Amino acid sequence: MSGTKNSMISDLWYKNAVIYCLSVGTYLDANGDGIGDFQGLIRRLDYLQGLGITAIWLMPFQPSPGRDDGYDVTDYYGVNPRYGTLGDFVEFTHGCQQRGIRVLIDLVVNHTSNEHPWFKQACRDPDSKYRNWYIWSEKRPKNAESGIVFPGVQKSTWDYEKTAGAYYFHRFYDFQPDLNTSNPEVQTEILKIMGFWLQLGVSGFRMDAVPFVISKKGADVTRAQEQYDMLRTFSEFLTWREGQAIILGEANVLPSTDLRYFGDAGERLQMMFNFDVNQHLFLALATSDSRPLKAALEATKPRPATAQWGQFLRNHDELDLGRLTERQRQAVFTAFGPEPEMQLYRRGIRRRLAPMLQGDRRRIELAYSLMMTLPGTPVLRYGDEIAMGDDLKLPERNCARTPMQWSTEPHAGFTKNKKPVLPVIREGPYGFNHVNVAAQRRDPNSLLNWMERIIRMRKEVPEIGWGDFSLIGCNSFQVLIIRYTWRNNSVVFIHNLESEPQEVRFTLRFPNEDKCELVNLLSEDHSFPNETGRHKILLEPYGYRWFRVGRLDHLLRRAPA
């Protein structure tokens, strides 16, 4: 039985992973052309291994005109020559395997580039099989201005194509025509794409825009009609080809819909980003009130045993606040993005975390400690580990996609070319002379070294990824207390969202634990209950604690992970 359990844990590797997202083009340039490449990324694998991450999620690197940072693909079976070759990619995956790091890649199959050969053929020849790979209408549909993803930038979801003599559907930009994913031929092609990259060593895919991928599309479609069984088809294919491979879905949907994406028995998506918790986490940070975050945690608690949430703070897109009420959204705008140039699409904030928190080290640590201890698997963005900033002079979301800052060398050590693919941040407190890996490596008290320690500790607490959680009540709504139990082991995490000290009092109220100590995993600040089993802890402003329930020798007697 023990062997079976450990085999299951190995298969469900994503339960206790730490995922690191990066763009090849902005990580490290090895050949000096100003653009990051796979050879540069290979040179930094030892750095990533030292950081402690266990999986790398690569943003799109396939051939593309680059009008949407690679999310407009022209060839699903290649590597953009700017980044290298398929041989370089295989060398990269082998290097990751040698270091115990898995690779996830973006799977962008809701749409292609309008320069993709499929779309060009569909436009030229109405009898081509590719014509039915896209969505067409002879007349401009009445709902052409509904369902716009990028308000203020995008004006319609239908545009006229002269060569085709018809209107085509595009949920996103007009240069990204939607694939007709209801077409069995398109679904077969998606499986073929996944199989190709699995053969080259990837462990799964971050599927872009999942709700749109599985929706029925067409001029006559007036309401959302999701085809959830499509996800089961994808998942079964992965299981057949590579048993441990996963799909991490981008599905910003209501909590009431989550189980339809996971599947009642976890037979659809293995992982999803928890957008609901993410938005309410920032609301909690903005208002110093844990209650909205608690509500989001409870709302997203139901999920199959094999399913997992991806918990994140910031990603490559804007901080989407679309699930909040107008009043809640304004509270977050006021706290973290008060200027119009900081906001995007009327619903989001286009900033990195550090400048949002005004560079306050205490708040930055609090935020990452929270993310690391929320139910699920933490997903970091490149540069998070050194508190990189943003460049609001760059358009839309590019402001938070600037090159990685490695050193004080010209162009932050990213490239020797005089013209990097995007400008590095030079000025202000987040300029590369102040914020870079080399300087923080030398400083034992730097955020980088703190992040390495917190990642190492997170991997030593599998209860977060595997266990059941419960919220513990206390005397302060500014404080969040969350407890996990797994294999007869328990851990408790406490976070003070307030800028003032908080004396927090609480009782665990679990059988036989009224006298249990709370052993601090990060310092010697242990907590001992009084005669009634009540704990009293003084938290400093934005303070946090990681505790294990049990006596001081309990760490030596834990069940193996």
Task: List the model feature ranges, each with a label.
Residues 2-561:
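Active-site and adjacent substrate-binding regions of carbohydrate-active enzymes
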